[in-house]
Amino acid sequence: MDSDFGIPRELSDLQKLRSLYKPELPPCLQGTTVRVELGDGTTACSEAGAHTISRSFPHTYGQPLAHFLRATAKVADAHIISEHPAMRVGVVFCGRQSPGGHNVVWGLHNALKIHNPNSTLLGFLGGSEGLFAQKTLEVTDDILSTYKNQGGYDLLGRTKDQIRTTEQVHAALTTCKNLKLDGLVIIGGVTSNTDAAQLAETFAEAKCPTKVVGVPVTLNGDLKNQFVETNVGFDTICKVNSQLISNVCTDALSAEKYYYFIRLMGRKASHVALECTLQSHPNMVILGEEVAASKLTLFDLTKQVCDAVQARAEQDKYHGVILLPEGLIESIPEVYALLKEIHGLLRQGVSPNNISSQLSPWASALFEFLPPFIKKQLLLYPESDDSAQLSQIETEKLLAHLVEAEMNKRLKEGTYKGKKFNAICHFFGYQARGSLPSKFDCDYAYVLGHICYHVLAAGLNGYMATATNLKNPVNKWRCGAAPIAAMMTVKRWAQNPGATSIGKPAIHPAAVDLKGKAYELLRLNAVKFLMDDLYRNPGPLQFEGPGADAKPITLCVEDQDYMGRIKKLQEYLDKVRTIVKPGCSQEVLKAALSVMASVTDVLLTMSSTSLDGQKPL
């Protein structure tokens, strides 16, 4: 019911305490003057897709990076905006709820009111459906009072539908025109921000004055690229899940007779599973990216787990904890191919009851091999982004079932001489995504809300609010905005020899980097985690004292700060221009040419190599 949105919440004592917490702002967002430096024009990270993206987004592709500056910064060509006319801005939650989303709204509201008390923030009720139907709630400080630093999306509600069809895009355009909006802020993940880019392009084409800004909020942690280090909600989800996992680890060690198979929410990528493993040290994690890269079959995975169980049994250990990402099922080559066939038939209108008889022989054989509960789940209609309904497919039960069958077989054959294998299965996801957000997510979301205002004040359209250098204290965060089109890639599929299918430009989920430092840390400890029971319990989410300022391990071990390095490069280039100018000596000119030629050759080689290897999910 729309009438339920925005009503005051009944708060516990802890919630009341959290509602009083005021997130810190970086220096560049303080005060009432917006200082923005626009850098060089951006390009797509893949040269092969740049042409396709530029054709699809002629008005918003190639826009410059925006850096917001502190008052003491001395930048000659900075734009200083001190006049702030009243604005009308709309905000909408798209996609699944993620802890911290409410603080984006709070930060945006505060920034609007600080710069002009007459500005208005309208929240669309019920997500994208409310956007299409022009259902709004004026967000006020009174309404926000019981939602500050709180979990969920119940302030405004949400939908998970895409803004995809021509009718939906035009409905959004009509809404923004009718409500005379200066800005529209879309809060969501990869799909929602792809939609934001499309809306921005459509609005620019239609000469609609509404500027569209995206905010990276998703528990999956898969909206990562050179501009976005992590997502709002990821820290909270991983901390809450890690506590649950570590509790299970302690239980396993106490009873010493169960193997726990735990599936974690997170869609196609395995970021949540990787982070939770580094925080809680379970015996084993199976990452979807590893499985896809090694082309491991269902039987390979079963053998891998069984061999681990047998190795532990030889040390008289009959317990363990194994983590699986929910996207694992789509990473197994033969199961992925089966799902593609099933989804194709479902889209053709074939009844689920008749699917099995219309599968290809090999797909039919695999389908018939699977236990009945998995068959039923694989027949579910796919999501709007064409992926399987991953949260509904009990991969943990499938793997436990196959491992149990194989261990019983080994026991019968005499190749395994240990105790009977016992499995217990869990799915962690819904338990965490409505949690009170962590201190980091509260700060990060609030800062991004303020950045949204700065983006709109600078008149930028088709941008995503960004904060980088996040592993450092808030006062060292770099605030800016990047064109969403620069984050896009274009998928290509080899349909058959000599024929390639090209997809639409989109932000694709970022996979776990199997060459990254976080994965390297996991591999370094994998054998010890498997055999030595080094279970680690981070405890409940902390808001004060030890642990309150902890950030995701995967964020802290990676050396990111792309925006900072872009600024540093610009400083070096400016120095070169200062030194090498008409009138400089021959020696200086020759040295500059020699160095530049070498640098250019190296960068061209590195660029082509890295782009060839970049494969989004």
From Swiss-Prot:
NCBIfam families: PFKA_PPi (TIGR02477), PRK07085.1 (NF005482). Pfam families: PFK. It is found in: Cytoplasm. PANTHER family: PYROPHOSPHATE--FRUCTOSE 6-PHOSPHATE 1-PHOSPHOTRANSFERASE, PYROPHOSPHATE--FRUCTOSE 6-PHOSPHATE 1-PHOSPHOTRANSFERASE SUBUNIT ALPHA 1. It comes from Ricinus communis. GO terms for cellular component: cytoplasm. It comes from the Eukaryota. This is Pyrophosphate--fructose 6-phosphate 1-phosphotransferase subunit alpha. The keyword Transferase applies. GO terms for molecular function: 6-phosphofructokinase activity; ATP binding; diphosphate-fructose-6-phosphate 1-phosphotransferase activity; metal ion binding. Regulatory subunit of pyrophosphate--fructose 6-phosphate 1-phosphotransferase. Belongs to the phosphofructokinase type A (PFKA) family. PPi-dependent PFK group II subfamily. Clade 'Long' sub-subfamily. Keywords: Allosteric enzyme, Cytoplasm, Glycolysis, Kinase, Magnesium, Metal-binding, Transferase.
